[in-house]
Amino acid sequence: MATTTSHATNTWIKTKLSMPSSKEFGFASNSISLLKNQHNRQSLNINSSLQAPPILHFPKQSSNYQTPKNNTISHPKQENNNSSSSSTSKWNLVQKAAAMALDAVESALTKHELEHPLPKTADPRVQISGNFAPVPENPVCQSLPVTGKIPKCVQGVYVRNGANPLFEPTAGHHFFDGDGMVHAVQFKNGSASYACRFTETERLVQEKALGRPVFPKAIGELHGHSGIARLMLFYARGLFGLVDHSKGTGVANAGLVYFNNRLLAMSEDDLPYHVKVTPTGDLKTEGRFDFDGQLKSTMIAHPKLDPVSGELFALSYDVIQKPYLKYFRFSKNGEKSNDVEIPVEDPTMMHDFAITENFVVIPDQQVVFKMSEMIRGGSPVVYDKNKVSRFGILDKYAKDGSDLKWVEVPDCFCFHLWNAWEEAETDEIVVIGSCMTPPDSIFNECDEGLKSVLSEIRLNLKTGKSTRKSIIENPDEQVNLEAGMVNRNKLGRKTEYAYLAIAEPWPKVSGFAKVNLFTGEVEKFIYGDNKYGGEPLFLPRDPNSKEEDDGYILAFVHDEKEWKSELQIVNAMSLKLEATVKLPSRVPYGFHGTFINANDLANQA
């Protein structure tokens, strides 16, 4: 994909929107004001899921597809008249006729869907309300106001990914369906700048050129018979050369990792995208990145960077055909290993995993993909209550899966794993993760309240048995902990502390907790009255420091009363606020981030 020099904005949604309550997140709300495509939604019995097929196996692509050249967009309505006509003018008569017919079918399908109420997990009036709503791109703003003093060690750029739909949803939409947008705060000599840009995925480039969304939304739309119909529509558009799915369909909105001199934006439905930070602090998409032709499959959004070897470890899953799950690694120079097939009976939701000094720890849990459920009118993502969760343990440098050991961990679903390490004296691997109940609570509507319990899971390599306990033993101190990290210089090694978002009132984040993983002691930092944020990022003050918590926590925070956003920098040892950077525009709640130090920035590929 050619790098674009122009940028997109989305102006279809008003800036200041009220939030649904934590109890009713996902229930229909009239607080969001869409500027077009208003519909009276009445009923549609859709079960929502976190992930739909990350790999779609399409028939051969027509050679008639013309890559759009006009990627500029300032407003969707204008785009429909300008770059849309530029793109469609290259179509032949057959393509134009096919486009009209398929558009008519899609309009009828959407009208039918919107005659029924959307579930709260797929209703855009809920999923992207309040500060979950998208924002336009923001060019670099320099010399931002700072309260307090930025620590000297904070030199580089903090980047955070998130979902930010460019176009107004026309039907079902889950928050996770949005286009990827990276927010960046660069620090130079005590001064800070801010910018946010869309990651210019192949999907986004084509939709910008057409002036509307045409790619299926994995969570909000691909359910039941209507989901099958939308897939067939997309296949048909590909066969006629109206869209090109051969270069991926992903949104790159979840994870970020800096590896081998490249910042990679990731979601598990595609290859990573290379995003470059410019000297001024702006962001520029370099393109879809396949590691010089070595990576032929998707890669999950949470690869693990070993702090000692510099290697990157990753997984890839396929929901259609075997092998359903593969493991691979990259040397610190970016050389890929052969794939190792991980034998699993069903394609499994695989958002995260863990590494130790010598092993990889691979969860095979109860949330699975069953595409046949769409034929029955349901979601392809299923909570299989008859399945027993288990963790696979494999040597990091294994050439095949013959020595893979499985240890069952009943009734355990960890969406994220924060760390793992080996304890040789007991022949155990200790895994730290947040166990979520109900397992499908962020996928489907349910009456039971979500609980995310920070847990210690011990996998005994000798006996093949496991134990699991809550790290915070006092029930009065128990809080939902999701999104966070340990000191990444200690990843795969025994760590004393974890820094995790306090996901209360769900789904908002009121602060972060510093948890002693040995004693269960909890220290909390609350962002402030009417202030909510996201994932806390731990930045070590000195990589060689003997104190594990010697560093700072960085987090985007939004004031829902004043409707202003800021970046807070907190001393990780004392939990005292060191500095606040006032941001020029709103930063929506998002997903995961990383920090790139100044030396690495200077050496970007």
Curated annotation (Swiss-Prot):
GO terms for cellular component: chloroplast stroma. It catalyses: a 9-cis-epoxycarotenoid + O2 = a 12'-apo-carotenal + 2-cis,4-trans-xanthoxin; 9-cis-violaxanthin + O2 = (3S,5R,6S)-5,6-epoxy-3-hydroxy-5,6-dihydro-12'-apo-beta-caroten-12'-al + 2-cis,4-trans-xanthoxin; 9'-cis-neoxanthin + O2 = (3S,5R,6R)-3,5-dihydroxy-6,7-didehydro-5,6-dihydro-12'-apo-beta-caroten-12'-al + 2-cis,4-trans-xanthoxin. Residues 55-89 are annotated as: Disordered. Induction: Induced by drought. Accumulates in dehydration-treated fruits. Repressed after pollination. Inhibited by gibberellic acid (GA(3)) and auxin (4-Cl-IAA) treatments. Induced by abscisic acid (ABA). Up-regulated by salicylic acid (SA) in roots; this accumulation is repressed by salt stress (NaCl) with high SA treatment but with low SA. Regulated by the NAC transcription factor NAP2. The keyword Transit peptide applies. Its cofactor is Fe(2+). It is an enzyme of class 1 (oxidoreductase). One of its GO terms (molecular function) is carotenoid dioxygenase activity. The keyword Acyltransferase does not apply. One of its GO terms (biological process) is response to abscisic acid. Keywords: Abscisic acid biosynthesis, Abscisic acid signaling pathway, Chloroplast, Developmental protein, Dioxygenase, Fruit ripening, Iron, Metal-binding, Oxidoreductase, Plastid, Transit peptide. Interfering with NCED1 expression in fruits increases shelf life and reduces seed number, but increases viscosity of juices and modifies fruit texture. Binds 1 Fe(2+) ion per subunit. Pathway: Plant hormone biosynthesis; abscisate biosynthesis. Expressed in developing and ripening fruits. Highly expressed in pulp. Observed in unpollinated ovaries (e.g. ovules, placenta and pericarp). Expressed in flowers. Disruption phenotype: The mutant notabilis (not) is abscisic acid (ABA)-deficient (including in response to dehydration) and exhibits a reduced growth and lower ethylene levels. Abnormal development of anther/pollen leading to serious pollen deterioration. Fruit-specific suppression leads to reduced ABA accumulation resulting in an increase in ethylene levels, by increasing the transcription of genes related to the synthesis of ethylene during ripening. Residues 1-16 form a transit peptide. Fe cation binds at H302, H351, H416, H592. It is found in: Plastid, Chloroplast stroma. Residues 80-89 have a biased composition (Low complexity). Belongs to the carotenoid oxygenase family. Has a 11,12(11',12') 9-cis epoxycarotenoid cleavage activity. Catalyzes the first step of abscisic-acid (ABA) biosynthesis from carotenoids. Required for ABA accumulation upon drought. Required for ABA-mediated regulation of anther/pollen development, including metabolism, cell wall modification and transcription level. Positive regulator of fruit ripening involved in the biosynthesis of abscisic acid (ABA); initiates ABA biosynthesis at the onset of fruit ripening. This is 9-cis-epoxycarotenoid dioxygenase NCED1, chloroplastic. It comes from Solanum lycopersicum. The lineage of its organism: Eukaryota, Viridiplantae, Streptophyta, Embryophyta, Tracheophyta.
